[in-house]
From Swiss-Prot:
Keyword Cytoplasm: yes
PANTHER family for this protein: PHOSPHO-2-DEHYDRO-3-DEOXYHEPTONATE ALDOLASE
InterPro entries: Aldolase_TIM, DAHP1/KDSA, KDO8P_synthase
SUPFAM superfamilies registered for this protein in UniProt: Aldolase
Subcellular locations according to the entry: Cytoplasm
Any GO MF annotation of the entry: 3-deoxy-8-phosphooctulonate synthase activity
Protein's UniProt name: 2-dehydro-3-deoxyphosphooctonate aldolase
Species this chain originates from: Proteus mirabilis (strain HI4320)
HAMAP family, sorted: KDO8P_synth
Pfam families given in the database record: DAHP_synth_1
Catalytic activity, as annotated: D-arabinose 5-phosphate + phosphoenolpyruvate + H2O = 3-deoxy-alpha-D-manno-2-octulosonate-8-phosphate + phosphate
Keywords: Cytoplasm, Lipopolysaccharide biosynthesis, Transferase
Length: 284
């Protein structure tokens, strides 16, 4: 299989290259917390020599409850991202929810993300494609891996082939997700070798069927991440928090920030081992 390389500045993302970490926090809770979390990620990834892109949302437009915290909004969010870039020299990824957000966001961040719930919205796809930015597409929980090729094709028709695909689990009955390890390879095939990354923390969400917030299983984040990265992927998508029990969004699935270094050391060891093997075609 041919492996497409997507460049985020000097960072190369491909399924056969050393993995890239897309990591940070779920939503911007405050400027100071974003600075603290980003600094820790930068320190750890530099120590372990892992290519790194900071992740956070400026607006969580798809919260379960109308009363849930959404974030600081577009203007304040872009100010925080700009300060993070100037202070730490990081690349940044964030999600957009409306076509009108695509251009102003692309002027600040390096990768714009198409949320899973919106991945088939053609107007949003077209607006994102027109920016020319690198795109990260979250696979909807209700879409099969093979169907992701159609979304990539929409971006190509819009003039943008700089697309990364991200798996964040698939519906498994009601209120539960499961990760299909075979699906990673299917996504690569369907997209003609596009980089595929794994959102491990969102894949650990589980819902109270009558509740107003997502639960999670952060006690299993290491096991699931090790399994996924053993497939041989372009990157890992991860959220961490210094106090997950009091995070304002998705704390139950967030990695405790203090565990970041030992966690990433394991992931890098697995990624390096898997990619040291020659590719093995067992189809014939």
């Amino acid at each position: 299989m041919q492996h497409k390389v997507v460049s985020i500045g000097d960072i190369k993302v491909a399924n056969n290259l050393p993995f890239v970490l897309f990591g940070g926090m779920n939503v911007l809770e405050s400027r100071d917390l974003a600075m603290r979390i980003c600094e820790h990620y930068v320190t750890v990834t530099q120590k372990l020599d892992i290519p790194y892109v900071f992740k956070a949302s400026f607006d969580k437009a798809n919260r379960s409850s109308i009363h849930s915290y959404r974030g600081p909004g577009l203007d304040e969010g872009m100010k925080i991202f700009q300060e993070l870039k100037e202070t730490f020299g990081v690349k940044i990824i964030t999600d957009v929810h409306e076509p009108s957000q695509a251009q102003p966001v692309s002027e600040v961040v390096d990768v714009i993300q198409l949320p899973a719930f919106l991945a088939r919205q053609t107007d949003l796809v077209e607006a994102m494609a027109k920016t020319g930015a690198v795109i990260n597409v979250k696979k909807p929980q209700f879409v099969s891996p093979g169907q992701m090729g159609n979304i990539v094709e929409k971006f190509k028709e819009g003039g943008n082939d700089q697309v990364i695909l991200c798996d964040r689990g698939s519906n498994f009955g009601y209120d539960n997700l499961v990760v299909d390890m075979l699906g990673f390879h299917v996504m690569m095939q369907a997209s003609e070798g596009a980089p595929v990354i794994f959102d491990v923390t969102h894949s650990l969400q589980c819902r109270d069927p009558f509740g107003a917030a997502s639960g999670g299983r952060r006690g299993q984040v290491a096991e699931l991440a090790r399994a996924g990265m053993a497939v041989g992927l372009a990157g890992l998508f991860l959220e961490a928090h210094p106090d997950p029990d009091h995070a304002r969004c998705d704390g139950p699935s967030a990695l405790p920030l203090a565990k970041l270094e030992p966690f990433l050391a394991q992931i890098k060891a697995i990624d390096s081992l898997v990619k040291s093997f020659p590719e093995l075609d067992t189809s014939k």
